A protein has these predicted regions:
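ATP-binding glycine-rich loop module of kinase domains
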Residues: 20-42
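Regulatory extensions appended to serine/threonine kinase catalytic cores
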Residues: 251-297, 308
């Protein structure tokens, strides 16, 4: 049965041009319902594979389908905040966050799945500061500001295109803004094709990033933000090594890192854990998802019918389980007596006028099943 058939609570989390997102409670568990705009399509094989991935950094898909020509997903609710709402983060925290994202992407890749639409809106940061990657398997280039150049040319997502998106995500987390902007599909495609010419370090310096941090980030830009897929790092394992090196240089040691991390998470605490709680945003489930549920009256009628049927069966059982002749015995006797009917018909005359008939004595000699209470029903022989 659909999870949505048991929804008892619903709240609107987000409504945008790409999708509507609801938080729903069904059978005591919290889920997210993401209902996409018309025209969005999923790769069915990818969605099936994702449902088999058990990694804390990857969302759990529970149900998928289509309503009113628009696809939808139901997945376990992730209590956190989209990275798109975080603003600029400390460099060490941003690198740590991206490193966790890369581990999640590697888990997907091990199952033959590539995200294809990695962007800050699809990375949910939980209350403990760890990320969960959502919205995998969409057909198309995805968010244009994060799509690799080859994706604009119609190529399917792969590890190389996801690596490019990781670079764009890292820049957004450090700078607080997107690296490339545009107002049309073509303008984004052109900007992506010219990404090699962007002086990322100068842009971040203008946003107040320290010189020592800029030098630690430089190898990451060179390994990720490249128009030609062959110029990017080989795979997620190589990227993880680069991130580990960069983190070690900017974190300032374990004590400094734990202090920075605790302060950053505390600063986010006012938002994390408040989304979808309480009555704010409460709404009805979209009518397209409404399912007929038994009302209290219908339940009572159904129960009464079932109970009546049970009582009838019990009565029949006791009626035919008494000591009188069984149905089979009665049938056999009737068959035997009927063999003499031809000889009797025509000889027996009714006292009132001669109509042929069957002797009443013969009929009285036929055995009948005994019924409970027979003889006590108030009927007597004349």
């Amino acid at each position: 049965m659909s999870i949505l058939a048991g929804v008892s609570q619903c709240a609107m989390l987000h409504r945008g041009g790409e999708a509507e997102i609801y938080k729903v409670v069904s059978q005591g568990r919290e889920y997210a319902l993401k209902w996409y705009a018309a025209g969005v399509r999923f790769d069915a094989a990818s969605i099936e594979a994702i449902s088999q991935v058990h990694d804390r950094g990857v969302y759990r898909v529970r149900e998928t389908g289509e309503k009113a020509g628009r696809p939808y997903l139901v997945y376990d609710f992730v209590d956190g905040i989209p990275a798109a709402e975080l603003g600029a983060l400390p460099v060490a925290f941003a690198i740590s966050l991206v490193r966790d994202v890369v581990r999640a992407l590697a888990a997907l890749a091990s199952c033959g799945v590539h995200h294809g639409d990695l962007n800050p809106s699809n990375v949910i940061v939980c209350a403990d500061g760890t990320p969960v990657v959502i919205d995998c398997g969409i057909v198309g280039p995805g968010a244009p500001a994060y799509a690799a150049p080859e994706r604009f040319q119609g190529r399917a997502p792969d590890e190389k295109s996801d690596l490019y998106s990781v670079g764009m995500l890292l820049y957004r987390l450090v700078a607080g803004v997107d690296l490339v902007v545009g107002d049309t599909f073509e303008s984004y495609a052109r900007a992506a094709s010219l990404v090699d010419e962007i002086d990322t370090t100068s842009l971040l310096y203008g946003r107040g990033v320290k010189a020592e941090e800029l030098s630690c980030l430089e190898p990451l830009w060179k390994g990720l933000l490249r128009a030609d897929p062959e110029d990017r790092v080989e795979d997620f394992d190589e990227l993880d090594e680069l991130l580990e090196i960069a983190f070690g240089k900017v974190s300032g040691g374990s004590v400094a890192w734990e202090t920075l991390r605790a302060g950053t998470v505390a600063a986010l605490a006012e938002k994390i854990g408040t989304i979808g709680h309480g009555s704010e945003g409460a709404c009805a489930l979209p009518v397209e998802f409404a399912m007929i549920k038994p009302t209290g009256g219908r339940k009572r009628v159904a129960f009464a019918c079932i109970l009546g049927l049970i009582l009838l069966l019990v009565a029949l059982f006791f009626a035919f389980s008494r000591g009188g002749p069984s149905i089979d015995e009665t049938g056999a006797s009737i068959l035997q007596k009927s063999r003499s009917l031809d000889a009797i018909v025509g000889e027996a005359q009714d006292s009132s006028g001669g109509d042929s008939g069957v002797s009443g004595t013969l009929l009285e000699s036929l055995p009948t099943p005994e019924l409970e209470g027979a003889g006590d029903n108030g009927v007597t022989d004349e």
